[in-house]
Amino acid sequence: MVKTYLFLAGAVFFEVAGTMLLPVTQNFTKLIPTAALAFFYLCAFYLLTFVVDKIPIAIMYATWSGLGIFTIAILGYIFFKQTLAWQAILGLFLIVIGVVLVNSYTGKLS
């Protein structure tokens, strides 16, 4: 199961890397950032194919998207100087709590 979660973490990493490139692509007019974005998304989905066999798809997707949202919000704050209101910060922590709760019951759902 550890290997499965490593694949899931890798998928989150590649999805976040691709999403962080979105502003750099300038509406997909810049070839190299656009190609890198596509490559990162392909890697993310490739890794997810190994995860979906071990974790129910709803839990896999909730974890992938939840951790991606949390990470992108933090990186957007750091690299793009985007502000986060206290409500957004609270919401992000609730997402993390939800991901932890959902994954703590993964074995019982399989």
Regions found by a protein language model. Name each.
Residues 1-110:
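Polytopic alpha-helical membrane proteins, predominantly small-molecule transporters/carriers
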